[in-house]
Swiss-Prot record:
It comes from Glaesserella parasuis serovar 5 (strain SH0165) (Haemophilus parasuis). ADP binds at residues 22-26, 156, 187-189, 213, 215-217. Catalyzes the phosphorylation of D-fructose 6-phosphate to fructose 1,6-bisphosphate by ATP, the first committing step of glycolysis. The gene is pfkA. The lineage of its organism: Bacteria, Pseudomonadati, Pseudomonadota, Gammaproteobacteria, Pasteurellales. Keywords: Allosteric enzyme, ATP-binding, Cytoplasm, Glycolysis, Kinase, Magnesium, Metal-binding, Nucleotide-binding, Transferase. Allosterically activated by ADP and other diphosphonucleosides, and allosterically inhibited by phosphoenolpyruvate. This is ATP-dependent 6-phosphofructokinase.
Amino acid sequence: MVKKIAVLTSGGDAPGMNAAIRGVVRAGLSEGLEVYGIQDGYYGLYHDRVIKLERRSVSEVINRGGTFLGSARFPEFKNPEVRAKCVETLKKYEIDALVVIGGDGSYMGAKLLTEEHGIACIGLPGTIDNDVAGTDYTIGFQTALETALEAIDRLRDTSTSHQRISIVEIMGRHCGDLTLSAALAGGCEYIIIPEKGFDKESLIRNIEDGFNKGKRHAIIAITELMTDVHQLAREIEERFGHETRAAVLGHTQRGGAPCAFDRILASRMGVYAVELLMQGYGGRCVGIQNEKLVHHDIIDAITNMRRPFKEEIFNTSRKLF
């Protein structure tokens, strides 16, 4: 029977993580459990950075961005000896189960603890990239979307005033969900995402066609890591003679107070994680599909499940632009 649980946040931070921690802590306490927080993710677990959490520990955090527990990337966790020491930390505090909030890398860590040591782990999807399998939305995605959209709206104002071409680089790594949604909502003229690839010459031809038809400005939304956006801006400007500038939104997309959607989603997922543990589940990851909370085998989610591409949204954007 579960008596003590711990929660950690791992990898890149995302708005709403604090709300998820709050959900885990208060749901756990309501079940009579002792709840611990692990500072700085798996790195903190390795270095015994464990603190006890009470109701007041999570007061006034639901509206705060980031994660008050801290987060860190810890590639050393791939080492079996490092994982074994992390398990020793859990045993030291007699912690029975662990809730891990993060992305694919965080899930992989939970998967290894489950497979190798039988630790009851529950994964919650916390990343602005929306690239975790088994869920329609991840914690932080909607807030990051609003941040990106605000930037696009501001760029449109100045691009229109100066007949400028603006390139906006949006986070997402190898997933184009954030770029696609922000571009559709922001009315961007061109969208470049990993799922559809990038043909520079085709982009330049499309821009040329648009200006030949009377366009006076353009906004290009592109997912990070696909190309050097500043070099692309220089090439476009040299080709057309139109002033072209690139804006990299970067880590501003991770910060800021979470929106209502993310606060609610994170709270629901945090409470649901505790419910699953009380029902005897372990080695699961939580998601939301068709507005309902679901859970999947965490190993299956990592190795077999794939996120479907939002083809309908992409096709809609093509018709509008």
